[in-house]
Amino acid sequence: MIIPKEILSLVEQVSPESWGEIYPKLFAALVEYGLTRVETELVLRATAKRLGVSYAQVWADWQTYLGHDPKGAKPRASDHLRELLEVEEYEVWRSPGNEVWVSVRLNGHVEHWPVRSARTEAWLRRLYGQVYKRLAPKVAVEDVMADLRATGLLFGDVHPVFTRLGGWKEEETGERRVYLDLGRPDWTVVEVTAEGWRVIPASEAPVRFYRNEYQRPLPVPERGGSLEPLWDLLPLQGERDRLLVLGWLLGSLNPWGPYPVLILSGEKGAGKSTAGEILKRLLDPTKAPRRSEPENEGDIVIAAQNNLVLLYDNLSQISPKISDAFCRLSTGGGFSKRKLYTDDSEVVLEAQRPVILTGIGFGAIRDDLADRTIRVELTRIADEDRVTDSQLWARFHREHPRILGALLDAASVALRRFDETEGELEAVVKGWYP
């Protein structure tokens, strides 16, 4: 949908003072260019917003200009729904990939959803049902969602969308801040700066988080935390492996990447799957955290859109195509995905995510992936040291706030020294090995 530049220019000139002069030119242009109904309504709504009046008033002027009786036509359900939106507090915008989003204030906090989503549809149906006490017609909801999408594409500001972890950089000072969405019902996030960290309402953060139904909440981190409980939970071989795991965890809290791929290997009984799940749950608890080997890039794209940390469990080998995808997740790259509701259009998604791979042996790993990996060999847990799953996870949940607090302390130090440590991933990874 493309609105002619002449019409957009006229809309930009609209004000209460200029309306008497502008509206004949604007309405004549609408007739001349033969805009569709949706395009015309979009222009009229933008005009009403600039005038500070209701859409109904501008629509009546338009009908009068056309020689129609503005009171003659019976309003449709979609018109009723549009009128309800005029008094709602919401914002339509788009992501860098041109996906249109809507931000809605609900119960004292703001949520961000794709316009084409079940949540947006449910919000519109609720607005309609609260007033008219009946179910909104499907066509009315679809019409209004199409309006929202057109508005976002043509007039929406561009904002990045983050899942669980987001980064912000001040243009003038170069100051970097990290935001971690706790995923809690109170809609709080952790703000990490070079001076420390604090828990704040998500509405005070300059980044926009998307929450999905798979995410689970993080605990509120404790100050004065410690990493010692983490080392008690993981069957690591010594100080070297602790430094490697700590480096990977801190790297995972860097929103700008890149991210080394962590490989956890070891003989049967070394607790590889559990160790991988512990590391994922530390930063990104989700429903069903362990994933089997992806069959194609599409599986990886979906996982990257809904997770911060990707845990692929019990792999035996990695195909060349999947190996290449893991490389792109590590250092950044595009993933092609067919655009919804089209036959041949594609959208390219940029994705970088921390990845954990577990397995007894992966066979030969291609050099480009090997250059991006950190390998940690876990020790077999002695029979006398084994505990039940319920005991292990009870310990984890008890210590989780302390461990998370310690990681955030370390992340703050990393921000203070960000410019000193920034460099090529290969050099960083190799530097971690003695």
Q: Which role does the model predict for each range below?
A:
Residues 43, 112, 249, 273, ...:
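Conserved RecA-like P-loop NTPase ATPase core
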